[in-house]
A protein has these predicted regions:
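Short loop/turn motifs at secondary-structure junctions and domain boundaries
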Residues: 2-4, 10, 59-60
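Active-site phosphate-binding/coordination module
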Residues: 25-127
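A general structural-boundary detector
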Residues: 4, 17-20, 42, 63
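Acidic, His- and aromatic-enriched active-site or binding-groove loops in soluble protein domains
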Residues: 126-134
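Asp-based phosphoryl-transfer active-site loop
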Residues: 7-24
Length: 134
């Protein structure tokens, strides 16, 4: 069996749960390890619940080898091109989703705008926590 080399593997890291510290920052040690991995031919990308803007801010100079999965995996965002590809859509379900969401208690509603900003339509405890981290 042929051994897989580091440059033949893409590592997908959960940014929010694995790499960030309790304060929601990317510690220098993790940043250094990611950069060392990449400098040795490792291929890396991240998954995050956060917006592309927030992920870029957290990663700083860490370069990704593939689009990041952001906004909870609903968007594949290529930072080198500054563009994203939607991985899911509510197309065709707008009426049912828009009718159902307002009646759900405790559910926050936020929209990710094309410019990367987030607009809260209805706040919840979870959404407040998430937006503070972003």
């Amino acid at each position: 069996m042929k051994e897989t080399t580091i440059d033949q593997t893409l590592v997908l890291c959960d940014l929010d749960s694995l790499l960030l510290d309790a304060a929601g920052n990317l510690p220098q040690l993790q940043r250094d390890v990611l950069q060392l991995f990449a400098s040795r031919g490792g291929r890396l990308t991240v998954f995050s619940q956060r917006s592309p803007r927030a992920v870029r801010s957290l990663l700083g100079g860490v370069r990704l080898s593939a689009p990041a999965l952001v906004c909870g995996g609903t968007l594949a965002y290529n930072f080198s091109e500054g563009s994203g590809t939607a991985l899911c859509s509510f197309e065709g379900m707008e009426e049912s989703v828009l009718k159902m969401l307002p009646s759900l208690s405790g559910v926050g509603i936020a929209l990710q705008m094309r410019d990367g900003s987030t607009r809260a339509v209805r706040m919840s405890e979870g959404l407040v926590f998430h937006l503070k981290q972003e």
